[in-house]
Swiss-Prot record:
It comes from Pseudomonas syringae pv. syringae. GO terms for biological process: glucan biosynthetic process. This is Glucans biosynthesis glucosyltransferase H. Belongs to the glycosyltransferase 2 family. OpgH subfamily. Its main location: membrane. The gene is opgH.
Amino acid sequence: MSNSLPVPMSLNEYLAHLPMSDEQRAELAGCTTFAELHERLSAQPVTDPAEAAQASVGRRLTLTPRDQLEDAEMLGVDASGRLCLKATPPIRRTKVVPEPWRTNILVRGWRRLTGKGNPPKPEHDDLPRDLPKARWRTVGSIRRYILLILMLGQTIVAGWYMKGILPYQGWSLVSLDEITRQTFVQTALQVMPYALQTSILLLFGILFCWVSAGFWTALMGFLELLTGRDKYRISGASAGNEPIEKGARTALVMPICNEDVPRVFAGLRATFESVAATGDLDRFDFFVLSDTNETDIAVAEQQAWLDVCRETKGFGKIFYRRRRRRVKRKSGNLDDFCRRWGGDYRYMVVLDADSVMSGECLTSLVRLMEATPDAGIIQTAPRASGMDTLYARMQQFATRVYGPLFTAGLHFWQLGESHYWGHNAIIRMKPFIEHCALAPLPGKGAFAGAILSHDFVEAALMRRAGWGVWIAYDLPGSYEELPPNLLDELKRDRRWCHGNLMNFRLFLVKGMHPVHRAVFLTGVMSYLSAPLWFFFLVLSTALLAVNTLMEPTYFLEPRQLYPLWPQWHPEKAVALFSTTIVLLFLPKLLSVILIWAKGAKGFGGKFKVTVSMLLEMLFSVLLAPVRMLFHTRFVLAAFLGWAATWNSPQRDDDSTPWIEAVKRHGPQTLLGACWALLVFWLNPSFLWWLAPIVVSLMLSIPVSVISSRTNLGVKARDEKFFLIPEEFEPPQELISTDRYTYENRWHALKQGFIRAVVDPRQNALACALATSRHVRLSRLKWCVWSVSIRHSRSVRQNSAIRNA
């Protein structure tokens, strides 16, 4: 790139930026104007000086000796006759029509009763189909009924224990005879403890059921991975060495928006080279679908695309398209691709900006699709790697150690009616185009408009159309990156929170499979559990205050012989507390046991992986209350209509400044201190039960800052703490990504917009990638304007005739 040279400010400096010999520059040094220079570069007469720069675009692009642009026939002419780069394949449009959402069951019922029916569905080439009854469907239904019984049974038993722990039993302190003869305040004071207890018991039941679901998912995942006898795993459908037929073309699409350009194209290049090494590159095309609206980044993307094509000889295989109108964010970006080029491909693999996939993984996904004709989506389990901050490395360790259990457990319960996470997955193109286009949600407010979290919805629509959605949890070669620090992760969580709350409006949409209704529910509970937990703690504190401050009444009746003593069952409290701890932390212990059984060398050895697990558990305890408060605020913000910003996440290691941490965590620290003082004043012994919450809140500032430090993360890696196999023995794709990222940052293009105007090569590239759509648009506007003029004249003439 030309970043090493200063921005040209004169004609001579402009010449210095051109890759020419000294003799060639000497020949052009006599030019007195830029128009004359461009005319001589183009080697053809230019009648309009304003068009001189455009005339020399082709020459400026191909000045480099042995330039591949001409060899690859990448130069063409657009609709206005200007030279352009063939950055995209020819457009062959396919109809993409979203079905309007009918979310109101009352309206649907009324239309059915009145005989009006519902609006017709969009027409497709073939109707949605139901697959033949397969054995895995019956097995999946039975398994999910068992899961429901286990969750509810556990919750009922725990709720019974919780009821026995609470201090006020059986409405014994309320006299029904006295209620009619006492004031409203007296009645409220008597009823308040029981109202608080009932609310606490209800919240406890919901939260315990949520924890129970995670426990049984992890437990079944542990058994699946330990035995290795999963006969329903999708990865067993292919032998792995079948030739991919010529017609099974796959598009790898990477939607990006204002991303870290060096990292994006480093991962893309590593993936491209890995696919090329398999010998099946002719079955794949790569698309970078940009929604970038920052001009400097957009120019850098164009140059990075040209560089990676030249370095990999990827012209005609790696394409770049930037949208001018960012409709429907990422889902709209994919819709636009499907509409233009989707009909040319049988499959599509969606990548995130930080995704890297091996060629073996990608070719295996295509083979699995070919071997499973009823599969609509096959999702891989991406492995997190590539970050160096202490926070990111602990999260990488957690996802690498605990994640396989939960992913395998999800597969055990869901089978072919599973999740799609929006990236690192292969999609069957035809049913996706016909059934998975997303219409905006009807209505107004924060939960209307374009769908934000599109992945769960697309999976639900694919299953509704009769296609399977699978998780290939044991397929290696799929990688992603995590946010570098807590605050960046929380920014991402706010977007996901809003998107999941929006998706719940589709819970009762007609035709959705019960499993995907449950997916919508679990998506909401991922964030709604935070305010429920917070309210549970607040109500528990309120009950403590009532129990402490209200004068106890031991005799309700005038001649009552025996007092009514408050009840306390410490054995039930200890049993319930121990059970909850087991449900929360046993999956982590099982993960480490599985690593011991399979081999702990890649995690630093048995001792190091065990110590890392204990440190991660401590860290998760410290962060859980912090996330609780943030997620509570996110949920309230969504219901209050506060917009969530959808900026690109931080992709590079970045530490949190102390000022930023104080600003974000200061209110939490103050809340934790005040809460601790209040509980200590009410009942000092109860503070021990609340200590994990209030201490974590008071330590949130230093924990957030210290965990974001890169030097601590690197030191932990050197000592083999929080080590993952991708660091112990990194695959070639990750090695290449790191190397290319370093090289790209060294040559990163700065001041892209200015260079696109004054730098000869950047200007030529920007002109060659510009479209002539504005020309056709001007003609269209002229036609519309002329028709409107004729119409207005006709109206005036008819009006004059009537008046006459």
